[in-house]
Amino acid sequence: MKRYTIIGNGVAAVGCIEGIRSVDARGPITVISREQYPAYCRPLISYMLEGRADQEQMPYRDAAFYERMGCDVLLGGDAVGIDPEARAVELGDGSQVGYDALCIATGSSPFVPPFSGLDTVASKHALMTLDDALGLDAAIDATSRVLIVGAGLIGLKCAEGICGRVASITVCDLADRVLSSILDAECAALMQARLEEQGIRLMLGDSVERFEGGLAHMKGGEDVAFDVLVLAVGVRANTALVSQAGGEVDRGIIVDNHMRTSIPGVFAAGDCAQGYDVSLGAKRVLAIMPNAYMQGHAAGVCMAGGDEVFDTGIPMNSIGFFGLHAMTAGTYEGACYEERGEGSIKRLFTEDGLLKGFILIGCDERAGIYTSLIRERTPLDSIDFEALKKAATTTAFSAERRAQMFGEAV
C-alpha cells in the first residue's frame, strides 16, 4: 500500500488530499502541519480583525474532513529536512515520517527587510497566519497608533481590518502607488482615494530609514511615532526543504505540469511552487488560492498513480476595500480596450488574437468569463468579443462553445 506524506496544511494540501483520494481510497496519508490548526481560509484573517468573521468560520473544510479522508495529521509538526534516498521526512524532534510519494505544500513566509533598529521595536507583527491575526488583535486598542510598512494586498487588508479600532493608521511604501504589483497609477488612485476617505494616511514613495523604539525615521525626513508596527513588505516562497535536498529551486520550487519536482517521488504545490503561467507562457510563483488548490489536486492525483496536468494557472486577484471592489488577472500586454464609468474602470488587454489580462475596478461582475478566456486561450475570432467588451455574458459564445466552456445546454 502506497504511503503519502504532505508537508503543509493549507489549501494546496487539501487539494492534494482530495486528489489522492480520487485515485487511491486506502493508502495512508500523513499531513505535517507547523500550525496548530486544521486547514483554514487564510484571506479571512483580516475579516476576523474587522469583526466580520470569527475563528469558528475560518476552517477550509468541515471538522470531519481529515477522518473522512483517512489522514493522520501532525499539528505543530516541524519538518526540518527530507532524505530522498531513504524516502523520509525528518522532524524537529528527531523522528522521521516515511513516504512513497511526498508533496511539499509549505507556502510562503513574510519577508523582513534588515531595517536598522528593528530590534528596538516592542510590538511588531506580520499578518500571514491565524496566530499573527490573534497576536495583532491582542496588541491593539482604541489608543493605538499603527504603522504598516507595505501598501500591497496584505498591508492594505490589515489597514481595513483594524480601521475604526485604533487611533490612527499610517501606511508607507517605497512604491509611488498602492497595490503597485497589480494596478497601474490611475486604477491605484481610485483605491487610494477610498482608503484615504476612511482616515488612513498613505506615505507613498517613502519608507523607513531606521527605527528607534516607537519612532520611525523615514527616508523622506519625517519622523512617525507609533505603538504597533506591522511589516507587510512581501513574502518569499518556502523552498529550503527542496533546495537542501538538492532539488531545483528559483523564486519557488520548480515543478512540471504534473507538479513533480526534480527529486524523484517529490511533488510541490501552492505558494511554494513555481509552475506554468498560461498568460505569461513561462513559469512563476502564482500565490493565490484557486491555483494552490488545483496544483495540489494535480499533485495528489499524480502521486497516487493517476495522470492530471495543471497548465492553466494565471495570476489573479479579487480584492475590495471599504466597498470598492477590483479584480485583475493575467498580464497587461498588447492592445488595451478601456471603458470608464463613475468610479469604475474596465481594461482588457489583447495580443495575438487572445485575451491576455484585465483590470476591473468597480465593475467586476461576471469577471469569471474573462478569466476563462485567458485560462483556455480562447481565440477571440471564435467568439463575439465586441459584445464581450461591453458585457461579459455567455451569449457572446456560440451554443456549442457555451456547452463546452460553461456546461450550458446547446
Can you annotate each of these PLM segments?
Residues 2, 22, 272-368:
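Mid-to-C-terminal Rossmann-like scaffold of FAD/NAD(P)H-dependent oxidoreductases
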Residues 67-83, 196-208:
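A conserved beta-strand/loop element that lines the FAD pocket in flavoprotein oxidoreductases
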Residues 3, 224-248, 322-402:
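C-terminal catalytic lobe of FAD-dependent flavoproteins
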Residues 120-141, 214-217, 222-298:
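FAD-site-proximal beta/loop scaffold in flavoenzymes
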Residues 59, 153-209, 291, 310-318, ...:
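Rossmann-like dinucleotide-binding cores of NAD(P)H-dependent redox enzymes
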Residues 7, 97-107, 149, 226-234, ...:
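Short hydrophobic core segments
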Residues 106-165:
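Glycine-rich dinucleotide-binding loop and its adjacent helix/turn
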Residues 2-72, 159-183, 369:
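Beta1-alpha1 glycine-rich phosphate/pyrophosphate-binding loop at the start
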